[in-house]
């Protein structure tokens, strides 16, 4: 078969198209099977996949070490290397996340609503799988397992195309996952990994109408922009996380410091990390925020007012307000109250996650209703922007658009619905 012989160096456009067509056809067959697979069988397959990952942990970590060494040689940034790195704890978390997905309520077949028309027709909407999902992603090997688990539990077949940075990690994780599927009696074609790193394969996936039902890109602006520009199949985009934390004049200072440090520094390389902090001019202790971040190892870039607070603050450029650092860097600006914060967020937010720190309930409600982002928070760290923290299990990403899902995309976001109409012989007049 093409998938057994195609290599990264030989994948010319015609060969890549043939490869994706073959994989898509097999995925389509698997998707038909999965759409009818009972919940218990899907859950058993995921548990078997998690077990296989644990059993093969040494091989997976060795593969990841190979990727890490190559990444360091190739000059990957600290943030990219952090996303790429696996250790025993992270690998255990991947297996645990798969089992957590297996324990979630199955959305497939769930009735959304039901009603009867005056003519006696009984209508209902029920959730059904999307079909075949193509995932194109960079750096994060955990996406291999998360996407496979979520896609399968939602009754979908999945075609994975990971980045070259994580090629060995992705292959090792996929091999373990596929072994679990086969052990549980489900088709290995339910989760396939594109075997070539040639960019032509990405283009072929984007043009695979009739074979792939939706593409979900996970990566930087360049990848997402290419997918959105070239795709002929629907796209569910996960864009950058230019997230804001607004510290209101009525914020509790101790709480504000703790939230600012956690939201920025807990893990700087994730999409839920705060990148810009806005401080109300009425807030009494702005220097405390700046000093706490610097003490935590964060570089602070500030507007004129913030730069005047400390000699350790760098002056922010115009581009800083539109930058997703994914690093220990934060931009801080002083604003004129809630209206100033809302105006800044409206101009610079990527519509991912924005938060307010305040003890004023009315101000909090104005912020929650006034910010047009997928996730809006009050007195909570933006690092909670995560499907697992929302109780959704693993996530495929944070959708920042409006169709067809928004926020953490987990099981329900990987389904659609169909109408069921039950009659007794009604004729339309």
Curated annotation (Swiss-Prot):
Family to which the UniProt record says this protein belongs: Belongs to the gamma-glutamyl phosphate reductase family.
Principal location class: cytoplasm
GO biological process, one term: L-proline biosynthetic process
Keywords assigned by UniProt, alphabetized: Amino-acid biosynthesis, Cytoplasm, NADP, Oxidoreductase, Proline biosynthesis
Organism: Sphingopyxis alaskensis (strain DSM 13593 / LMG 18877 / RB2256)
SUPFAM superfamilies (UniProt xref): ALDH-like
EC number: 1.2.1.41
Database matches in Pfam families: Aldedh
InterPro entries: Ald_DH/histidinol_DH (IPR016161), Ald_DH_C (IPR016163), Ald_DH_N (IPR016162), Aldehyde_DH_dom (IPR015590), G-glutamylP_reductase_CS (IPR020593), Glu-5-SA_DH (IPR012134), GPR_dom (IPR000965)
UniProt KW tRNA processing keyword: no
Lineage, opening ranks: Bacteria, Pseudomonadati, Pseudomonadota, Alphaproteobacteria, Sphingomonadales
Purpose: Catalyzes the NADPH-dependent reduction of L-glutamate 5-phosphate into L-glutamate 5-semialdehyde and phosphate. The product spontaneously undergoes cyclization to form 1-pyrroline-5-carboxylate.
HAMAP family assigned to the protein according to its UniProt record, in alphabetical order: ProA
GO MF annotation terms: glutamate-5-semialdehyde dehydrogenase activity; NADP binding
Any one GO cellular component localisation term in the record: cytoplasm
Reactions catalysed according to its record: L-glutamate 5-semialdehyde + phosphate + NADP(+) = L-glutamyl 5-phosphate + NADPH + H(+)
Stated name of the protein: Gamma-glutamyl phosphate reductase
Entry annotated with the keyword Cytoplasm: yes
Pathway(s): Amino-acid biosynthesis; L-proline biosynthesis; L-glutamate 5-semialdehyde from L-glutamate: step 2/2
Cell compartment(s), UniProt: Cytoplasm
